[in-house]
Amino acid sequence: MQRSLSMSGKRHFIFAVSFVISTVCLTFSPANAAQKLSCTLVIDEASGDLLHREGSCDKAFAPMSTFKLPLAIMGYDADILLDATTPRWDYKPEFNGYKSQQKPTDPTIWLKDSIVWYSQELTRRLGESRFSDYVQRFDYGNKDVSGDPGKHNGLTHAWLASSLKISPEEQVRFLRRFLRGELPVSEDALEMTKAVVPHFEAGDWDVQGKTGTGSLSDAKGGKAPIGWFIGWATRDDRRVVFARLTVGARKGEQPAGPAARDEFLNTLPALSENF
């Protein structure tokens, strides 16, 4: 849980101010990408009460592949996505996808294997107007789908280390609205989206969630990994909503998103003893 620190004296004041400035710079300035930041946030789905908060949870970053969840809602609501296995789209060379993603993909595979080109083909079929309208109506993050300055690529790249940003606090608020049927879409769209979000186990919790992996560039050309894991966990009749974010963590064998996922799954059973 977060702790409040009592500070007195000039040195403590200077240290506190410096810390705040450096944290803000990490959010808005790639030059400080080497610094580390993390957040683990858990709220009760029914009441919205805070259950656990640790780290800097109000700083906004690109959602990366966690944005596939709202994209799925849009796709089902717009009748572009029809069920868990329809449509199944073939890969095309012009998609410029990673080699591992150059395969026929349906909504279940899309979420499970985090297929970037499927997201982009979905937004192309939505079109700029409908895509932007959904983001605005969802009140998702900063709602900026303009993309990279001067590139006019928001339709296919806004969520990929570009203009669209969201904080862990905003992620859990959005997810709670989704789970409670408070988004301005059809009930079928909500239920079909829930059906394709991957399942994981964490002790006696059934967890559904989506990872996201990206990076911040620093002034020297270095990269600081960004890892997301967002979703909900159910045990008996209790459901909680969570967001886990890491920025600048040491690179390991796993990409940052799956690493954030495994960290959360490993710690949830112990965390939930205090829920």
From Swiss-Prot:
GO terms of biological process kind: antibiotic catabolic process; cell wall organization; response to antibiotic
Gene3D superfamilies referenced in this protein's UniProt entry, alphabetically: DD-peptidase/beta-lactamase superfamily (3.40.710.10)
Regulation: Inhibited by clavulanic acid, sulbactam, tazobactam, and imipenem.
Keyword Disulfide bond attributed: no
InterPro entries: Bact_Transpept/Beta-Lactamase, Beta-lactam/transpept-like, Beta-lactam_class-D_AS, PCN-bd_Tpept
Assigned GO CC terms: plasma membrane
Keywords attached to this entry: Antibiotic resistance, Hydrolase, Signal
A GO MF term: penicillin binding
Pfam families: Transpeptidase
Task of the protein: Has a broad substrate profile, hydrolyzes amoxicillin, ticarcillin, cephalothin, ceftazidime, cefotaxime, and aztreonam, but not imipenem or cephamycins.
Family membership: Belongs to the class-D beta-lactamase family.
Protein's UniProt name: Beta-lactamase OXA-18
Organism: Pseudomonas aeruginosa
